[in-house]
């Protein structure tokens, strides 16, 4: 597939890394096996997509089996993250979480993350084409900035 470069794969790794670090930080404060499994599945799904793009960029081979786990792993990972939060609802200091989220500058980064993820959802539904390099660049830039905003929001929240 034309235009799938090593650079695209490396940019695709940014949101996977940012999200992974974010999940490690949250997991250190919310020790839940379900949360950890969900985070691991989500990150592994992203790693599969990065690996697919790396192979495309380096060897010019389309190993679609590397890309296929992305959606099911991400969806099941996010579902487990949500279930873990619901199951651990009473164990979470929601007042503390809320105060951290609305603190400045964290709230700016969290707001940007939510907006960018909403835009990403719209973009993937309406414009994204998996086989188009330009479409992948756009999606990865949106996702890289969004996941970095999540990480910065968490870091500034303390």
Q: Regions from the language model: what does each represent?
A:
Residues 1-41, 50-158:
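Polytopic alpha-helical membrane-helix bundles and their juxtamembrane interface segments
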Residues 47:
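Conserved phosphate-interacting/catalytic interface
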